[in-house]
A protein has these predicted regions:
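A short mid-domain helix/strand-loop element embedded in enzyme catalytic domains
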Residues: 152-182
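A long amphipathic alpha-helix within ATP-dependent nucleotide-binding catalytic cores
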Residues: 181-212
Length: 226
């Protein structure tokens, strides 16, 4: 079967399942937290993370797509398995194509955003900030003359806070001085974020793709391990 035939088969199957998507979940009496895409259930000694077919953009749910949850969940599980030599992760098991059973962790209130290119269109994107004239961003100094979509000389970590209403860009010095993280934890997590991104770039390149930017979240498990 060639690629075009394979794509056609997938399209046909998706068309049949357009009205059969996973948009809502219910897991008995377990305490539930609902995100834009994932539902989280507290199982006592672990968490059940259910990836639905909900499609979100710009902080809102727009639609649902057949099999999206399975693809996203299994892709995540694959990446976690591929990167466990860099840093441990929260996965206990993949209980279902849509479900991961995970360790409970206390998440650091910082999102580790790593960028390989100067691009984007949102108010917090690196290109928007740069195009507005800023040359200092999240503790990084940017040179003059950069063009949109240009590859950065080196990967850049641009952390943001995890706050209830609005995440804000923040520098490493501010992270420590404002007590978001200790210096030791920041040094370790920032190093691992850059290692993860470099590994992701390598894997993407091997498959004819580029990893432009991504976000990592980290935390401590009940044994104190990051």
């Amino acid at each position: 079967m060639n690629v075009l035939e394979s794509v056609s088969q997938y399209k046909d199957r998706i068309s049949v399942e357009l009205n059969n998507t996973l948009t809502e979940t219910e897991l008995g009496s377990a305490k539930k937290k609902t995100g834009k895409v994932r539902d989280q259930y507290d199982l006592g000694n672990a968490l059940a993370l259910i990836t639905t077919d909900r499609q979100s953009a710009f902080d809102r749910v727009l639609a649902s797509i057949p099999f999206k949850g399975q693809v996203l969940n299994l892709a995540s599980a694959w990446w976690f398995d591929e990167t466990k030599h860099i840093i441990d992760n929260h996965i206990i098991s993949v209980a279902d194509p849509n479900v991961i059973i995970a360790k409970k962790c206390k998440v650091f209130p910082i999102e580790f955003v790593v960028r390989g290119f100067i691009t984007g269109s949102t108010s917090t994107s690196l290109w928007t900030v740069y195009n507005n004239g800023d040359r200092e961003y999240c503790g990084n100094s940017l040179p003059e003359g950069l063009k949109k979509n240009q590859k950065l000389v080196s990967n850049m970590l641009t952390p943001t806070t995890k706050e209830e209403h609005h995440d804000r860009p923040i520098s490493p010095d501010e992270i420590v001085s404002e007590n978001w993280m200790t210096q030791e934890d920041w040094d370790y997590c920032s190093k691992k974020a850059l290692e993860l991104f470099e590994f992701g770039q390598k894997k993407a390149k091997e498959n004819g793709m580029i990893l432009v930017d991504t976000k990592y979240e980290m935390g401590r498990d009940e044994d104190g391990n990051i």
